[in-house]
Structure formats: C-alpha cells, structure tokens
Amino acid sequence: MILSDEKCDFLESIASFLGPKDVELVFVDSKEMQEINLEQRKQDKTTDVLSFPLENIDESLPLGSVVINVDLAKEKAKELGHSYEEEISLLFIHAMLHLLGFDHENDNGEMREKEKELIEYFNLPKSLIVRTLG
C-alpha cells in the first residue's frame, strides 16, 4: 500500500506487484527537491526522483520513502509526449527498484533490464533511460 497525502491509486498496482510492504510517497516541487538532494546527498541541484530505504528492523515499517519532483515530471511528460501519470509511474518504478536493492550505478544492467520488464508489463511508455538502451 502507498502511504501518501496525494491521490495516487494508479500506482497501487505497481506497488502491490513489487512487494507486500508499504511505501511512503511524497510529492514535492523542484525547490523542495533541491533542498532534499542537498541535505541527503550533498548535491545542490534538483532531480526527478529520490528513494530512501528504511532499515528492516521492524516488519511493520514501510519499505522506504519515494520523493517525486512534480515539476520535472510534468516537464518530462510533455517533452516525451506521454501523460503526467505515466511519467509518475516510470519514476515510481525506478525508485521502487532502488528500495528493493537494485543500483544501476554498480550493477551490470540488471536494474535497467528489470525496469524495462516492468515498463512493458504495465504497458507504460519507454522512459528516457530505456530509450537510450536501444
């Protein structure tokens, strides 16, 4: 189940498919995202999505938190010619894979391949990352 103040029913099927644990979902603007990115990652710039896994000390705790930049999601959706909800779904999949332990910076393409499989399964448009894979 997704824990969020925003209505995001369209993401529930993705969250349920990827696991039984709850996930906190937060929507922010570009300025807020830049502040979070600076505080958490020492990067003084905005970004589209961040994920923060929680230590699995207690099974009742959520898997972690996903923070999505709505400003960049709207821009990217317009640029790539798909809906805002589709872009949010693409970002959510990417972040969920990070929460599940995938890391595209250190693996041999496993995360990208899993992301591609999920995008196809949920009949979403290809993300920019998947488009660059060929």
Swiss-Prot record:
E.C. number(s) listed in UniProt: 3.1.-.-
One GO MF term: zinc ion binding
Entry's localization field: Cytoplasm
Residues involved in Zn(2+) binding: H94, H98, H104
Cofactor(s) of this protein: Zn(2+)
GO cellular component, one term: cytoplasm
InterPro entries: MetalPrtase_cat_dom_sf_prd, YbeY, YbeY_CS
Enzyme class: hydrolase
Pfam families reported in the protein's UniProt record: YbeY
Keyword Acyltransferase assigned: no
Domain of life: Bacteria
Keyword set includes Lyase: no
Key words of the record: Cytoplasm, Endonuclease, Hydrolase, Metal-binding, Nuclease, Ribosome biogenesis, rRNA processing, Zinc
Cofactor binding note of this UniProt entry: Binds 1 zinc ion.
Biological role stated in the UniProt entry: Single strand-specific metallo-endoribonuclease involved in late-stage 70S ribosome quality control and in maturation of the 3' terminus of the 16S rRNA.
Family membership: Belongs to the endoribonuclease YbeY family.
Protein's name according to its UniProt entry: Endoribonuclease YbeY
Organism field: Campylobacter jejuni subsp. jejuni serotype O:23/36 (strain 81-176)
Protein encoded by which gene: ybeY
